[in-house]
């Protein structure tokens, strides 16, 4: 999947924080395909990549404002409330995104990997890691900076 692109009427962008994780997953799947072209589709990374595409194309871009994507207070309150997240991969993976209904834009902010699976109370928990990223400003918390940083990377 290349970014930016238009999906279900939404302009879909990938922030560098998401793009880095996504590209690593794509590279892993391509390496698996090179090693074992007949069986790579059975591997966990290949299945995960397929689920990521499905989540983006059939869930996020269909209704980004769905109540199912609200994170409650998992990222704290205040300025992080505008981030949404989708759960997948047996509840261990999270893909965080922001959207603007007015602009019809969705920005994929970050997706955790096998090193940051959802594990309550751990330093490597997806919410803990993403909260720290937001505190450091990468990705930025405000829409204007997020949009600018995302556009500069494409």
Swiss-Prot record:
Keyword flag Transcription: yes
Leading EC class: hydrolase
Entry GO MF terms: endonuclease activity; RNA nuclease activity
Signal sequence interval, chain numbering: none
Keyword Hydrolase part of the UniProt annotation: yes
Cellular component GO terms, alphabetical: toxin-antitoxin complex
Enzyme Commission code(s) on record: 3.1.-.-
Keywords: Endonuclease, Hydrolase, Nuclease, Repressor, Toxin-antitoxin system, Transcription, Transcription regulation
Effect of inactivating the gene: Deletion of the prlF-yhaV operon has no effect on virulence in mouse infection; the disrupted strain is as virulent as wild-type.
Known role: Toxic component of a type II toxin-antitoxin (TA) system. Has RNase activity in vitro. Acts as a transcription factor. The YhaV/PrlF complex binds the prlF-yhaV operon, probably negatively regulating its expression.
Subunit structure: Homohexamer; forms a complex with PrlF (SohA) with stoichiometry PrlF(2)-YhaV(4), possibly as a YhaV(2)-PrlF(2)-YhaV(2) complex like the MazFE complex. May dimerize in solution.
Protein name per the record: Toxin YhaV
GN (gene name): yhaV
